Swiss-Prot record:
A Pfam family it matches: Rota_NS26
Coiled coil (UniProt feature): none
Residues where Mg(2+) binds: D92
Family according to the record: Belongs to the rotavirus NSP5 family.
Post-translational modification summary for this protein: O-glycosylated. Hyperphosphorylated on serine residues, when in dimeric form. Phosphorylation by host CK1 is required for the hyperphosphorylation of NSP5 dimer.
Protein name: Non-structural protein 5
Subcellular location: Host cytoplasm
One term under GO cellular component: host cell cytoplasm
Needed co-factor(s): Mg(2+)
Compositional bias annotation for Low complexity: 17-30
Chain intervals for the UniProt region annotation (Disordered): 17-37, 53-72
Organism listed in the record: Rotavirus A (strain RVA/Human/United Kingdom/ST3/1975/G4P2A[6]) (RV-A)
Organism classification: Viruses, Riboviria, Orthornavirae, Duplornaviricota, Resentoviricetes
Complexes and interactors: Homodimer. Interacts with VP1. Interacts with VP2. Interacts with NSP2; this interaction leads to up-regulation of NSP5 hyperphosphorylation and formation of virus factories. Interacts with NSP6. Participates in the selective exclusion of host proteins from stress granules (SG) and P bodies (PB). Also participates in the sequestration of these remodeled organelles in viral factories.
GO MF annotations, alphabetized: ATP hydrolysis activity; magnesium ion binding; nucleotide binding; RNA binding
Amino acid sequence: MSLSIDVTSLPSISSSIFKNESSSTTSTLSGKSIGRSEQYISPDAEAFNKYMLSKSPEDIGPSDSASNDPLTSFSIRSNAVKTNADAGVSMDSSTQSRPSSNVGCDQLDFSLTKGINVSANLDSCISISTDHKKEKSKKDKSRKYYPKIEADSDSEDYVLDDSDSDDGKCKNCKYKKKYFVLRMRMKQVAMQLIEDL
């Protein structure tokens, strides 16, 4: 994957700030890294205080000040920059010559002259190999396999004694076979319970 961006053909940006008030003063901000001059409107503290004190607190609204606090409003107005339609701020040309008249000029002029080239190759291989043993389900684990118990004590040929029958009436009973099958099953269950214990 390759990405190439060329920004050399972008136009440069140029604009200016012009000050047309003779009462403006010039101050240099030494705290900033950009050593250039900025011009502010010189505040008239007496006129502002007189204006604010002449109005009752109920009459002071948002249109009079950005804040109802006179000190805050004074600070805001003292740092306000007067601009016109050709406004701009200089970031580069601090040593640019200013007009001969008493008009301040700040210039913003920069152009992007660097090309950005991004090249990245994505090459990856994913191999997954697993040996999964089939786990028995919980039902299979809970199920126990018991050994089969053979019961050979009873058989179909077994004949009841007269003492076990009512006067020998059950010797040839039609339920005899079903009785012995049920008896054998019950015996197997009993033997299995004994083994489990």
